[in-house]
């Protein structure tokens, strides 16, 4: 018991005296939580610059311009003349779209010649292009329906008849999840999961690889070295404990940014706990197998860096090649993000997250078993290197 207390004290001392570990594990999560929170705080993109070139300059064309200006998503940039090089003007003004109203627009409408309004979308940024496109379509669609209703009413139809004539059926579009299309609610929880996995892997990358370089490892773990599970637990304990502190930080930030919380807190913490264990065990495995701390870090970052992109959270898995889909299944972040989306964004029933819990559970066990085997082999190699018997036991602890 005395030796166990010494080992725990030793491990926490190593953790708190490692400045890199402290900055990564405590400063990085707070920094990214606030940075991403303030970045996406508005939730929606508004005031997207849109170039409007009105060649007609009539009451009807001006009405379209006014309607575009009334849309809070758009910020209209009025042009009387079309720029010589339109693409350069789009780049210079960072416009999300260009709306060109042709000459004789009003006259052709009154004569039923169906004039065309050209809308050019700047798809160099797909996100702003989609927001701009949706806003412009809504505005022009409203204007078109209103103009057609007026034309039918002039022919003697009442408002209801005119509406039925231009809209023979009604389609209702009902949003089920994230009804306000808030980008903060969609992205922030997922990015915090990415940050948590990243700091865990960075912390674990140096845990064993650095430990094996210390001559004190054999002496300090004398008597306990035969119990690889205990050695692993002692080395992981600080990360497990302080991961909970990071989760608490994320919780407080979510309250500030008004991000919805999971309805079943127990289910959330259970899945998050198994995610932390799975990510920790992955880090342990690589740290044991790769003796150099820098190389271990590089390998884990190769796994972790693209994890969010290939997780299926934004770009669906069914649109990826099969070999990438299979690779994503061995990264703890993938099932956790799926469960997180159900719990936070979709507010789904608890049973829908069960398969992701078991996915993480299996990953955790597989990485644990592989790490345990690797550690047993590594300890034997160290005893052989130092020409010591495995019955070696040094009880000189303070």
Predicted regions located by residue number:
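Juxtamembrane interface at the cytosolic side of transmembrane helices
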Residues: 200-232, 236, 380-381
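Membrane-interfacial helix-loop-helix connectors in multipass membrane proteins
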Residues: 215-220, 253-269
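Extracytoplasmic/periplasmic domains immediately adjacent to an N-terminal transmembrane anchor
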Residues: 1-183, 352, 376-398
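Long, hydrophobic alpha-helical segments
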Residues: 188-206
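Hydrophobic alpha-helical transmembrane segments
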Residues: 127-144, 177-188, 192, 210-222, ...
């Amino acid at each position: 018991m005395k030796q166990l207390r010494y080992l725990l004290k030793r491990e926490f001392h190593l953790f708190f005296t490692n400045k890199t570990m402290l900055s990564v594990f405590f400063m990085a999560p707070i920094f990214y939580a606030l940075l991403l929170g303030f970045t996406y705080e508005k939730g929606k993109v508004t005031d997207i610059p849109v170039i409007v070139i009105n060649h007609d300059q009539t009451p009807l064309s001006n009405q379209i311009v006014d309607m575009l200006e009334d849309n809070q998503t758009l910020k209209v940039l009025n042009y009387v003349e079309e720029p010589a090089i339109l693409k350069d003007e789009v780049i210079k003004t960072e416009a999300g779209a260009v709306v060109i109203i042709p000459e004789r627009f009003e006259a052709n409408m009154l004569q039923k010649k169906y004039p065309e309004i050209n809308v050019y979308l700047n798809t160099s940024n797909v996100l702003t292009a989609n927001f701009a496109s949706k806003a412009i379509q809504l505005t022009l669609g409203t204007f078109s329906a209103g103009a057609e209703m007026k034309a039918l009413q002039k022919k003697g139809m009442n408002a209801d008849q005119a509406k039925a004539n231009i809209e023979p059926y009604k389609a209702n579009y009902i949003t089920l999840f994230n009804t306000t299309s808030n980008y903060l609610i969609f992205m922030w929880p997922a990015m915090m999961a990415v940050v948590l996995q990243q700091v865990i892997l960075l912390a674990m990358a140096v845990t064993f690889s650095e430990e094996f370089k210390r001559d004190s490892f054999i002496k300090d773990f004398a008597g306990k070295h035969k119990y690889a599970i205990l050695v692993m637990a002692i080395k992981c304990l600080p990360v497990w404990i302080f991961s909970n502190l990071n989760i608490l930080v994320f919780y407080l930030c979510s309250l500030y940014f008004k991000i919805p919380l999971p309805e079943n807190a127990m289910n959330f913490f259970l899945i998050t706990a198994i995610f932390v264990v799975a990510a920790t065990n992955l880090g342990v495995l690589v740290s044991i197998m790769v003796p150099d701390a820098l190389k271990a870090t590089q390998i884990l970052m190769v796994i972790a860096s693209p994890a969010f992109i290939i997780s299926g959270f934004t770009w669906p898995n069914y649109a990826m090649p099969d070999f990438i889909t299979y690779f994503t299944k061995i990264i703890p972040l993938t099932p956790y993000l799926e469960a997180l989306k159900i719990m936070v964004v979709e507010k789904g029933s608890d049973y829908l997250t069960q398969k992701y819990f078991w996915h993480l559970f299996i990953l955790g066990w597989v990485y644990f078993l592989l790490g345990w085997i690797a550690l047993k082999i590594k300890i034997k190699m160290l005893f052989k290197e130092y020409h010591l018997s495995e019955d070696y036991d040094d009880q000189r602890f303070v």
